[in-house]
Amino acid sequence: MGKTLFEKVWNAHVVTEVKDGPSILYIDKQLIHEVTSPQAFAGIEKRGIGVFRPERTLATPDHNVPTKGQNLPIVEDLSRFQVDKLTENCNKFGVTLYGLGHASQGVVHVVGPETGTTLPGMTIVCGDSHTSTHGAFGSIAFGIGTSEVEQVLATQCLMQTKAKTLKIEINGKLAKGVTAKDVILYVIAQISAAGGTGYFVEYCGSAITSLSMEARMTICNMSIEMGARGGMIAPDETTFNYIKGREFAPKGAKWDEAVAYWKTLYSDSDAVFDKTLKYDAADIGPMITYGTNPGMGISVNKNIPSLDSIEESNKVTFNKALDYMGFHAGDSLIGKQVNWVFLGSCTNGRIEDLRQFAEFVKGKQKAANINALIVPGSKQVEKQAIAEGIDKVLAEAGFELREPGCSACLAMNEDKVPKGEYCVSTSNRNFEGRQGPGARTLLVSPLTAAAIAVSGKIVDVREMLN
């Protein structure tokens, strides 16, 4: 019987299997940031051991960092402490750190791929839910807890139970105005925020293989939002072209050897998945969430579901979400005013996202009622945006390109949305209070965010495209 992509990568990393228990899995790369690493470093220090393979760990501060004035001391005490502690720990244990001011600093899931740290066939972990981003390269990548961060620092291994496999096949061509973010929001809306629980997802089909690497990262990034352990896409020429020449990519003969191996990383034609779902790209429109989990999503031109259409077991959650958001069952969102637009995060803070946003707003003006946060995912993205003149296009339209960080994706830094206000966000989570106490989040694509930013209200971007 053939093997799935997940099985091939998993089997290549099993050190040993525990009878009737988990496997001990070798971890190729661990990415760390300032929030989930202090306790892990404290743990290995208390035990009197070092980092087993420091060259396989890469650190960068992202969650707590300000997106303006990064040359100045961080104002908030806890944020400053955590960023300083990361620097101290990396220096003490010999871990590579891209600190504030470094040319490669940024959101950890943007930095990994753009530096060539992320490669096909790897196992990659991070104390962060959206580690699944790296699965776009055909790697097994997943988020772990702080105690597991410590395990990997100490041993470069992790005990893991093998997940089931879920194949999500999407064929056809995406319509104008529909992007990768809409694809993943559509899938999550179809299967719910818990529909992927217990599975590792492989995305495939013509609609997936036609996407750029940055678009594929957007899709894999949000795998966790359907409850899945992670998501993967088989590497192909698009993958290889993206990686080639990057700082830590293999060079010379090693590149040829690597590509030869990477070309074996696909699901065999006779591989058996535990579950398969198929979708038609033509059915997907520009998406927007209306509730308090990413599964509460609709095409922007559709109405919020009626209460009668909601399963009995979900009605309490549905009503609670609508009450928090200030919406009603059956409402149309078209025309509703919003207060904030956030472009950024590990989901949509890459150069293609900035290009898409800037191209749309060029020659237009930010609506007067909109507060905008335009945040590149890394210093490299920021540098590229400036080189392309994106900062000037944004400025002429009334927007400001800020410095890199997680920003308004989560309320752990200065970029917070005030209570009761609506933020149209290109990030990955719309939980209660995610962007600030009482903040109301609506998840969208960068293209839809751009349309709303210049309109001041929720619109269907397709009606504004030539």
From Swiss-Prot:
Catalytic activity: (2R,3S)-3-isopropylmalate = (2S)-2-isopropylmalate
Record GO terms (molecular function): 3-isopropylmalate dehydratase activity; 4 iron, 4 sulfur cluster binding; metal ion binding
Pathway(s): Amino-acid biosynthesis; L-leucine biosynthesis; L-leucine from 3-methyl-2-oxobutanoate: step 2/4
Keywords noted in UniProt: 4Fe-4S, Amino-acid biosynthesis, Branched-chain amino acid biosynthesis, Iron, Iron-sulfur, Leucine biosynthesis, Lyase, Metal-binding
Record has Iron-sulfur as a keyword: yes
Domain of life: Bacteria
Binding site for [4Fe-4S] cluster: 346, 406, 409
Keyword Metal-binding: yes
Alphabetical list of Gene3D superfamilies matching this protein: Aconitase, domain 3
GO annotation terms (biological process): L-leucine biosynthetic process
EC number(s) per entry: 4.2.1.33
EC class of the enzyme, as a word: lyase
Details of cofactor binding: Binds 1 [4Fe-4S] cluster per subunit.
Pfam family, one: Aconitase
Cofactor: [4Fe-4S] cluster
Family of the protein in this entry: Belongs to the aconitase/IPM isomerase family. LeuC type 1 subfamily.
Subunit composition and interactions: Heterodimer of LeuC and LeuD.
Function of the molecule: Catalyzes the isomerization between 2-isopropylmalate and 3-isopropylmalate, via the formation of 2-isopropylmaleate.
HAMAP family per the UniProt record, alphabetical: LeuC_type1
Protein name: 3-isopropylmalate dehydratase large subunit
Organism, scientific name: Cytophaga hutchinsonii (strain ATCC 33406 / DSM 1761 / CIP 103989 / NBRC 15051 / NCIMB 9469 / D465)
